[in-house]
């Protein structure tokens, strides 16, 4: 690990809190910022994270950013500040599940600002985040992938580059379709089992 790296983590909530904990345990310097809920921030500061009072302060001292936000709109709002304040060559790893059009626009803006923007939407949930068992679906330039992998390694069990920027969002969408379709199929199978007089609890154990 490069001890000169200073990570700014934006979105230390349900998914992000576990990621920050794992980054801290791996020895990274992590800076966090509060939004609505202070509890995760207070807990992370107690573990060694540094709290920043504003995005402006964070942009002036961090050379790597990880975004884990609830929507593309939130990402655009944050990046409007970061892209205007961050130093050239700053690496921005966006773990948000974004719309493809958002990724393309952020990539364009980052290039104009001489920043390195990478998309890395995640698979898994809160428990996987805490256990460092997330999956990262990365879309980026080839030369950025090694550094991105090293940064995300403490948080993720699987990190795969699917191609250039945009492929992360595309692959995550397909992954969501697959998960939703599988869940629907399971529900329908259980309903059919119940309707046909099959003990669905025993059937579930057999099928699991």
Give the role of each language-model region.
Residues 55-116:
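Rossmann-fold NAD(P) dinucleotide-binding segment
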Residues 1-61, 90, 126:
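NAD(P)+-binding Rossmann beta1-loop-alpha1 motif at the extreme N-terminus of oxidoreductases
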């Amino acid at each position: 690990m490069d001890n000169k790296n200073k990570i700014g983590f934006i979105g230390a909530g349900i998914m992000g809190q576990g990621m920050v904990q794992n980054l801290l345990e791996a020895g990274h310097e992590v800076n966090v910022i509060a939004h609505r809920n202070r509890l995760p921030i207070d807990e992370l500061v107690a573990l060694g994270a540094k709290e920043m009072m504003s995005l402006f302060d964070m942009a002036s001292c961090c050379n790597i950013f990880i975004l884990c936000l609830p929507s593309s709109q939130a990402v655009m709002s944050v990046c409007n500040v970061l892209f205007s304040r961050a130093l050239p060559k700053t690496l921005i790893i966006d773990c948000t599940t974004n719309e493809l059009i958002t990724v393309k626009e952020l990539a364009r803006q980052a290039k104009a600002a001489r920043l390195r923007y990478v998309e890395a939407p995640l698979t898994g949930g809160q428990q996987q985040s805490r256990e460092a068992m997330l999956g990262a679906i990365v879309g980026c330039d080839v030369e950025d992938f090694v550094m991105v992998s090293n940064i995300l390694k403490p948080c993720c069990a699987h990190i795969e580059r699917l191609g250039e920027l945009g492929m992360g969002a595309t692959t995550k969408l397909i992954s969501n379709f697959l998960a939703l379709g599988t869940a629907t199929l399971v529900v329908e199978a259980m309903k059919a089992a119940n309707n046909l007089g099959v003990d669905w609890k025993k059937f579930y154990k057999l099928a699991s």
